Amino acid sequence: MPSQFDSRIERSTNAKFPAEKGRYHLYVMYSCPYACRVLAARNLKGLEDMVGLSVTHPVDQRTRPDNENDQHMGWTFVDPEKTPSVTGMNDMHYPTTGCIPDTVNHVNFIRDFSTDIVRMLDSAFEELAPSKFQLYPDELGGEIDASNDGIVAEVNRGFFTHALASTTEVAQINLAKFFTTIAKLDEMLARQRYLVGNTLTEADVSMFHTLIRFDHIQKKTNEQQLTQFQNIVGYLRDIYQTPGIASTVNWDHMEFAKVNRLPDAPASEGPFVEYSSPHDRAALA
């Protein structure tokens, strides 16, 4: 779906939206894997003091709860009185509702596609960022794109078709298909530390935030478990222990969102992976 927010932050000081400290603000929801990918990019680049952050409630709420005819759902904040109002394009006022993540400057909404925002944070702030970490290095761009369109998309699609299945029977069928993809990923990770090259990239951040959500919702009674795939377990520990990543994970918000969507479902039994335990992934570098 095309976005009405398709502007870009650029390095040039003469750009319409130049990279500047304190000019941009990020709105994220911890229960959303796409928003957490962007939050991870902000942290890995060391932009915490340059790009502001507001965290929404883990579940969309009715934006006009007193109007029974308006069923629109959108962002809410734990303390909305402290959240700055936002003026969008053409001086139009926008309540804090919509698709997340969003990057906003003091005048306009900029972008709401997670991959675009990740790459803007990675490139536009390169000269200002304390960290020289690159999520999308030019020399690996083609391989990262192939990974995103390949194994990352397969795992993401498998997770959502299982998690959002309409019946238990369909969920089990989709789960079996998902683990076929997981086995392929585990075999890949037996040979290499990361999905692309010898460094963590945006492909790994995307994969991580999908896999941990599956770990959260999987059941002890499942015939197959994520913990049976030791290369994936080590991979998840490796990424989780990378500075800036652990703070993008909020298990409580994930559970709150799941319970809201499936109020009759039992409480989640995961996560099962011990994310803070040692790993030996560096040996593959």
Where are these regions (language model features)?
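C-terminal alpha-helical interaction module
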Residues: 1-285
